[in-house]
Amino acid sequence: MKNVDFVVEESDRILLIEVKDPSDPRTTETARQSFVQNLKSKQFVNVTLVPKCRDSYTYLHLMADDRKPLVYIVILSLYEHTDRPDLFVGLQERLKLRLRKEGKKKWERQFVQDAVVLNISMWNRRFSYQADRRIS
């Protein structure tokens, strides 16, 4: 099973949070560029992001911990000084579509209420009560 990085239970929903951090100062420029290329491909959504969300949901469901709506949040530590980085355009919609239909038929049950892709500054504006910052 592949699981998301964090599961946060709020009063009215459960946040499934996946963090991708190619802006880490320890990341080489080659690795960063490779990540950006991968981000543009179907592979990133289909093989990296969706299985983590689905598997995390499956675990919560089997443990009877899925009684609240689920929101999948992907935090990409890229281009922190823009509100809507070019690379994010379309990524969120591709993610939502794939979460609803992985095969030929749509899932009969939608297991995620919403999915959003944010950078850290966008996260901090939207979730100011749980601000995020780099510590290393």
Regions found by a protein language model. Give the residues of each.
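Conserved catalytic cores of phosphodiester-cleaving nucleases, focusing on short active-site segments
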Residues: 6-8, 15-21
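Structural motif
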Residues: 13-15, 71
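Flexible, glycine-rich phosphate/dinucleotide-binding loops
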Residues: 15, 25, 81
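Catalytic cores of nucleic-acid endonucleases
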Residues: 22-77
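General secondary-structure propensity
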Residues: 41-45, 121, 129
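Short, low-complexity, polybasic intrinsically disordered segments
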Residues: 70-127
